[in-house]
């Protein structure tokens, strides 16, 4: 139940609340959600790189390459048929 707090080690609730309060004072209420989102995105990409998962851009490139291969094959098969006729 408290597994996410294991990252903080021996920090108690009062220390965590104090850190959050200082972060609120430093960055303000408007920037704090965007900073938390950016931090979450960074952690997510770090975990993906550790597990070896590819990002969306490499998947899109591989899909585009797969789409282009059948087009090239159809061109070569048509040219072979026209040469044999």
UniProtKB/Swiss-Prot annotation:
It holds the Pfam family TatA_B_E. One of its GO terms (cellular component) is TAT protein transport complex. Residues 64-76 have a biased composition (Basic and acidic residues). This is Sec-independent protein translocase protein TatA. Keywords: Cell inner membrane, Cell membrane, Membrane, Protein transport, Translocation, Transmembrane, Transmembrane helix, Transport. Signal peptide: none annotated. GO terms for molecular function: protein transmembrane transporter activity. The gene is tatA. Residues 50-85 are annotated as: Disordered. Forms a complex with TatC. Belongs to the TatA/E family. GO terms for biological process: protein transport by the Tat complex. Part of the twin-arginine translocation (Tat) system that transports large folded proteins containing a characteristic twin-arginine motif in their signal peptide across membranes. TatA could form the protein-conducting channel of the Tat system. It is a single-pass membrane protein. InterPro entries: TatA/B/E (IPR003369), TatA/E (IPR006312). It comes from Leptospira interrogans serogroup Icterohaemorrhagiae serovar Lai (strain 56601). Disulfide bonds: none annotated. It is found in: Cell inner membrane. Its main location: membrane. The chain crosses the membrane at residues 7-27. The keyword Lipid biosynthesis does not apply.
């Amino acid at each position: 139940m408290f597994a996410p707090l294991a990252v903080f080690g021996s920090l108690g609730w009062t220390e965590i609340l104090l850190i959050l309060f200082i972060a609120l004072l430093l960055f303000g209420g408007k920037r704090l959600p965007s900073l938390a989102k950016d931090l979450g995105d960074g952690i997510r990409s770090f975990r993906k790189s550790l597990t070896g998962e590819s990002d969306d851009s490499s998947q899109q490139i591989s899909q585009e390459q797969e789409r282009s291969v059948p087009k090239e094959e159809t061109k070569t098969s048509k040219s072979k048929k026209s040469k044999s006729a």
